[in-house]
């Protein structure tokens, strides 16, 4: 799966695959292929969401409040 996809692109592709599978007229081999691709897209979306959660935790700090911004080199 191409990790260069944005979250929105991955979700869109996943929705498209789900729509195809829900129609019910997909041959078995093709359905399995769609399912595998969908699982990869789902994993990619999950990884991207976890990354955003980690970034938000850093921004908000442990107490849930915004942390003051410190520019690189301004730590002292």
From Swiss-Prot:
* Gene Ontology terms for molecular function: exodeoxyribonuclease VII activity
Question: Record's Gene Ontology CC terms?
Answer: cytosol; exodeoxyribonuclease VII complex
One GO-annotated biological process of the protein? DNA catabolic process
EC code = 3.1.11.6
Enzyme group, top EC level? Answer: hydrolase
Q: Which reaction does it catalyse?
A: Exonucleolytic cleavage in either 5'- to 3'- or 3'- to 5'-direction to yield nucleoside 5'-phosphates
Superkingdom of this protein's organism: Bacteria
Q: List the keywords (alphabetical).
A: Cytoplasm, Exonuclease, Hydrolase, Nuclease
Which positions form S-S bridges? none
Entry annotated with the keyword Cytoplasm = yes
Its annotated compartments are: Cytoplasm
| Function summary | Bidirectionally degrades single-stranded DNA into large acid-insoluble oligonucleotides, which are then degraded further into small acid-soluble oligonucleotides.
> How is the quaternary structure described?
Heterooligomer composed of large and small subunits.
What family does this belong to? Belongs to the XseB family.
Give the protein's recorded name. Answer: Exodeoxyribonuclease 7 small subunit
Species for this entry: Bacillus cereus (strain G9842)
Q: What is the lineage of its organism?
A: Bacteria, Bacillati, Bacillota, Bacilli, Bacillales
Q: By which gene is this protein encoded? A: xseB
